[in-house]
A protein has these predicted regions:
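Hydrophobic, Leu/Ile/Phe/Ala-enriched alpha-helical segments that form helix-helix packing faces
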Residues: 40, 44, 96-103, 128-129
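Active-site nucleophile-adjacent alpha helix/oxyanion-hole segment immediately C-terminal to the catalytic cysteine
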Residues: 1-78
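Noncatalytic regulatory segments and standalone regulatory/sensor domains
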Residues: 153-215
Length: 215
């Protein structure tokens, strides 16, 4: 069984949500100037219909500075800038709480490499997806880490085997709902999952998640 968050659909524009009109959700480097965590957050906010795609890709977007959207836009696009090398999820949660508390609430969880912690991530992921919420997910591999947006999972005989994600580092087909997959528990050891894109694959573990909900 495959479960994808409600509202995502394939149109001539690719994977979209409907917010006044069809809004393409996937953002790739070049659409915005910034780090993978911020890309993933903005895809999340588009999927939640908090922002339109044009609002996050057009850096000339004008918001009143005293509104919640104006404050958030200033935090990410003006005060910090998007090319500072990224944020920890805890920093992003703080910014969301500071600037966007009327619009959304967020929670951060961190995970060790233990079997129990990685299983806790899968439980958190299932709860989020079943509630039709994307989950910003940090994967760690040898020599680095990367932030992606989980939008669904595949369950086989009651066990989640795969997690479907939108990765801002890669292109996406116009006919696809996702462009990367985490295949769970593929090997023993620290990097127990396999992360697959159309270009490569890496052994990874999940180190952190950020869940955002509309109020």
């Amino acid at each position: 069984m495959i479960k994808i968050i409600r509202g995502l659909d394939i149109t001539a524009l690719g994977v979209c949500v409907y917010n006044r009109k069809w809004q393409p959700v996937h953002l790739q480097q070049g659409d915005m100037d910034g780090a993978c965590a911020v890309f993933s957050i903005m895809m999340n906010l588009i999927a939640l219909k908090v922002f339109t795609r044009n609002q996050v890709t057009n850096l000339n977007t004008s918001f009143k500075g005293n509104t919640s959207k104006g404050r958030l836009f200033k935090e990410f696009f003006v005060t910090q800038g998007l090319c500072r090398g990224g944020f920890y999820f805890s920093e992003i949660k703080e910014k969301l709480s500071h600037s966007f508390a009327k619009e959304v609430m967020s929670s951060v969880r961190q995970y060790a490499t233990s079997v129990s912690d990685q299983a806790s991530y899968v439980e958190e992921l299932k709860i989020a997806i079943d509630d039709n919420l994307p989950l910003v997910t940090a994967i760690t591999f040898r020599g680095g880490a990367h932030a992606i947006l989980a939008i669904g999972y595949e369950e086989q005989e009651g066990v989640i085997r795969k997690i479907f994600c939108l990765d801002p580092g890669y292109t996406i087909s116009q006919t696809s709902l996702w462009n990367s997959v985490i295949t769970l528990n593929e090997r023993k050891g620290m990097y127990c999952h396999q992360y697959i894109t159309d270009n490569d694959d890496k052994n990874v573990f999940v180190s952190e998640t950020l869940k955002i909900e509309r109020k």
